[in-house]
């Protein structure tokens, strides 16, 4: 199932939220009706919060069913809220505050529960990232861009990436993430940073409200969401 929506008129949902196979984090500005619809589509428990006193949740943190990486500028109150949410939902998730010069972990890491791709900008933290997310990784860029997280969206079945990703890079991504499908595409009527526009897991996807019909078909194909 795929749902189209906006967050207070904004269609870059992936910048402001995070969804995994088992949990989700959304900005405080999202109304309760939209929250419930997204939770139903993705079939996950979710909560609303800030990261580092910011609504840029998806840009600043990255996670999968095994772990969650947040920047060290995340406040103690925010960390406690995350811990409480995980405990209330019986989720065994490694939570790590990582100190790095570039704190946009969501923009620089693309992960699912099988593997992760780490931007060269975070290569020195490879071991920590692998340990927290409990996956093997590959370090590198694709489409000549270091922002491997914001330019891709991955589930345990498939992955959609920037349209300029070449064939060798597609094979590399597929091998690391161990998915059946890797496709090139866009969202929100031509936006190439698909990770900034889409939230997805194997059960469903939430896409920016500007996403066209043909783009939705490509998203469904790449993420194996076609019934």
From Swiss-Prot:
Function: Binds to the 50S ribosomal subunit and prevents its association with the 30S ribosomal subunit to form the 70S initiation complex.
Family per similarity comment: Belongs to the eIF-6 family.
Protein name: Translation initiation factor 6
Gene name in the database record: eif6
Lineage summary: Archaea, Methanobacteriati, Methanobacteriota, Methanomada group, Methanococci
Pfam families membership: eIF-6 (PF01912)
Database matches in InterPro entries: eIF6
HAMAP family with a match to the protein in the record: eIF_6 (MF_00032)
Gene Ontology MF annotations: ribosome binding; translation initiation factor activity
Domain of life from the UniProt record: Archaea
Database matches in SUPFAM superfamilies: Pentein
Record flagged with keyword Protein biosynthesis: yes
Keywords recorded for this protein, A-Z: Initiation factor, Protein biosynthesis
NCBIfam families given in the database record: eIF-6, PRK04046.1-3
Biological process per Gene Ontology, one example term: cytosolic ribosome assembly
